[in-house]
Structure formats: C-alpha cells, structure tokens
Curated annotation (Swiss-Prot):
The gene is queA. GO terms for biological process: queuosine biosynthetic process; tRNA wobble guanine modification. Its main location: cytoplasm. It holds the Pfam family Queuosine_synth. This is S-adenosylmethionine:tRNA ribosyltransferase-isomerase. Disulfide bonds: none annotated. Belongs to the QueA family. Its EC number is 2.4.99.17. The keyword Ubl conjugation does not apply. Monomer. It catalyses: 7-aminomethyl-7-carbaguanosine(34) in tRNA + S-adenosyl-L-methionine = epoxyqueuosine(34) in tRNA + adenine + L-methionine + 2 H(+). HAMAP family: QueA.
Amino acid sequence: MRVEEFDYTLPEERIATYPPAERGSTRLIVLDRAADSITHSVYASLHERLRPGDLLVLNNSKVIRARLIANKPTGGRIELMLLEKHEGVQNLALYRGRLKVGDRLLAHGAELTVEALPDHGVARLSCDTANLTELFEAHGSVPIPPYLKRDAEEVDRERYQTVFAELPGSVAAPTASLNLTDELLEKIKAKGVDVVHITLHVGLGTFLPIRSETFEEHVMHREFYNIPESSAHKIGEAKARGGRVVAVGTTVTRALEHAAPRLLDSDFSQEVSGEADIFIYPGYEFRIIDALLTNFHAPRSTVLMLTAAFAGKELLRRAYQEALERDYRFLSYGDSMFIS
C-alpha cells in the first residue's frame, strides 16, 4: 500500500488556527461503520453517542513548555521545539533556521551544542549547564503545532491543554479531547459510561511527515505510555463482558492496541507500561477499541492512516469530502469525528 493513497488537498482556510470561542463548541461528524452512514452533529452531544456500559478511555498526559528561542553567537535566531522529555544528556528538537553539526547556540545563559542532525529539520542537542528539559520548562513556551504559523499566545496556555491533563511529558496535546469539558464529562458519566485514564506522552512522530513511498519503508516513532492497574482491569473487564471500549484519540488507540496481549490476558491484573511503536494502517485488526473519537488529520499522516484502518478507507474518504464541503475546521483546534 502506498502513502500517496492518503494524500488529499487541505485548503489553508480549513485549518483552525485558533481554538473555538468556547471549549466544546465545535462540530462532530458521526460515522456508523455497520450502516455505512455519515451524519452531522455537534461535539457537545457526544454523550448521546455513548451507551450505558461503555468504557471511555482518556489520555491524561500534560503538554510541557517545549518551544524555545535560541541564538547563534553571530546573532542568528533559531526556533527549537523539544521532541521528547527525558532526563538524559541529549534531546531531540525540531528547528527552524540553518544548523550544522558542531554549531553552538545560546539560550538564557546556557550553551547548546548541535551533536547530530539525524533527520530533516531535527537536531540532537546537548546543554552545558543543565539538562535540556529543565531549560525548556524554565524558559520555554507552549509548543503549538508549526502549521498554525503563529507564535503561542495567552489563549494557548489554557486551550492547548485538556481539562484533565495531569502528568507532564507531551510536546503536543492529545487533541481529540481538547473540547471535552467538565460538564460534558459529567453528562457522560451520568449516562452510565465509565471513564478511565491512561498516559501516553505525545512525541516526535506528531510533527514528522512520512517520507517513504510505501508503508513497509516507514519506521514508526516510539512513545512512552502507562496504563494504571485500575484502568487495565476495567479495560480487560469491558472486553470480557462484550462492552465497548471507546478510545478518545489516536494516542489512546496506539497505547491500547500495543498493550492488547496483556490487556486481554484474563490472568493479568497489573499496570502496563511500554513504548508504543505500533504503526496502524488499513488491514490492521483492532483487538481493543470498539469506537473512536478523533480529529480531522493532515494528509499523508500516520494518524490519518490509523483512522482509515478503523473507519474503512472509502467511508473515511466520503466523510472528509463532506467535511470539506460543509466548511468543517481541520487539525488540532478543529472539529471532530466519532466512529462506531
């Protein structure tokens, strides 16, 4: 299967560059796979799509301050976007500007060194005074996606974070749940839907396009995840009794499907941690999730391919066409899709 099959024209005016005026005031396109149907609704009606006994799974990872401006000794400005959070000596970062191996950058009293350039627009950096994560957390800003083509503003500090974000570590938000409000979550629970949290720290692959021509050539990025014991137990229990597991976002989907062998083991009742490197595309057989809430994704992206694997290529193609014709808003701050 070729990557070009997942290309489409996304007009720039269809990209939501700011969040909606009120959290949760977005639209929702609804795909029913069994009926091969598409209907149009609003995000605030999500609870009406759920059933008593469903299990809603959320990603509680919190976006860290991952964007930093550094300068070359000559004065040139370099924008850096941290791509992974760990306590090691070196970290990967996206960069805007011109860099070569050995270049030194200055940022808030620290000196950074370009140790390697492992991919287009990606640098491996070291820091002379502290670990890079601490430097970014102290002086960085919200890492809104590069395709928004603007600097982060005050509104992004609140709105590029979910209302239940808890554990710091992501360099991008789990965007499917950006429009979930406390009020909507209460309506969902009141309907008899159980809600559990997992953690997957969103990292490198969110910003890097697929450069290969075929799926087989693509090397998927790794993202750390943790499924607490209580959540793992409820997921396994839901599958055992035939209940629906509803994944809020592709990050939740990747974590659950990667952990499927342990979650489906009837003798297993512990937390699950790992590094999800699973590449989900059409032909994949889902073992855990039964419904998916997600956003409209960029062309040729791995998350678009995951969505196509779950919805079916043709149904998803029709849904995207209808969404474009009806002026839906796309990408992180945009409208959403519910697939059952």
